[in-house]
Amino acid sequence: MSATKTLEAVARDRVGKGAARAVRRQGQIPAVIYGGNQAPEAIAVDLIRTRTLIYAGGFKTTLFDITVGGKKTRAIPRDYQLDPVSGVPLHVDFLRVVSGQTVTVDVPVHFVNDEKAPGIKQKGGTLNVALHTVSLDVAPDQIPDAIEVDLTGREIGDVIHASDLRLPAGTYTGEPTDTVANILPPTVLGAEVEAEEAAIAEAQSAEAAEEKAEAEAEATNEKNDTEE
C-alpha cells in the first residue's frame, strides 16, 4: 500500500455555512475527523495541498497523519465534496483509524502486459473491462494501491473473474464469480460500430429528406402566393 502521508491542519472553533465560507476565503478547506468512539473534530486544511492530493488519485485509499495543534491523528479520507463548476474542493471527511478496524474502499484495477496477450496482440481482440475498481473490506494499513491483472497468454473468449485476482484473503465484498473483464473478438465490436454508423447515416438521410421536402413545400407556397 501507499506510504502514510502527512497533513497539517488547524482546529476550527466555529462550524456552519458562514464559518465554512470564512475558512475558504483564507485559502483553506473545512474538514472533519470523526469515528473511533471520539467526538468529531472540526479542522481546516490547506486548499492547494489538499486539491493536489485529491487530483493525484488514490486519495480515499491513502492513510494520513493529520497534525492539529501538535497532536497527531491517523485517519483515512471517506468523502469529499467538489464545487460542481470549478472543481475546487469544498469539504473533506476523515475517519479516525483505530486498532482492529476495517474500512470498505474501492481499489482500482490495473491491467498489464496486454502486448503479451495473443488474443489482443495477434488476433485483434479487445479487452472489455467490466470492473474498473473492486470493493474491499480491509484494514486501513493493508489497503492495496491497485489490483494488478496480468494479461499474459490471454486469448479471445477468456473471462477474468474476481476469483482470479490476487486479493487480501476474505476482503472482497462481491462474489467470486463476478466478471472483471473479458476479451472480445474483433467482429463483435466491429459489428456494433457498423450498426451504430448505419443508424446515424439513416437518421441523417431521413433528416435531409425532411428538410428538402420542407424547402420544396415552402418554395411552392411562395410561388402560389406570387401568382395570386
From Swiss-Prot:
The keyword NADP does not apply. Residues 198-228 are annotated as: Disordered. GO terms for cellular component: cytosolic large ribosomal subunit. InterPro entries: Rbsml_bL25/Gln-tRNA_synth_N, Ribosomal_bL25/Gln-tRNA_synth, Ribosomal_bL25_b-dom, Ribosomal_bL25_C, Ribosomal_bL25_long, Ribosomal_L25_dom, Ribosomal_uL5_bac-type. Gene3D superfamilies: Ribosomal protein L25, beta domain, Ribosomal Protein L25, Chain P. Pfam families: Ribosomal_L25p, Ribosomal_TL5_C. One of its GO terms (biological process) is translation. It comes from the Bacteria. HAMAP family: Ribosomal_bL25_CTC (MF_01334). Part of the 50S ribosomal subunit; part of the 5S rRNA/L5/L18/L25 subcomplex. Contacts the 5S rRNA. Binds to the 5S rRNA independently of L5 and L18. This is one of the proteins that binds to the 5S RNA in the ribosome where it forms part of the central protuberance. Belongs to the bacterial ribosomal protein bL25 family. CTC subfamily. NCBIfam families: bL25_bact_ctc, PRK05618.1-2. This is Large ribosomal subunit protein bL25. It comes from Methylorubrum populi (strain ATCC BAA-705 / NCIMB 13946 / BJ001) (Methylobacterium populi). The gene is rplY.
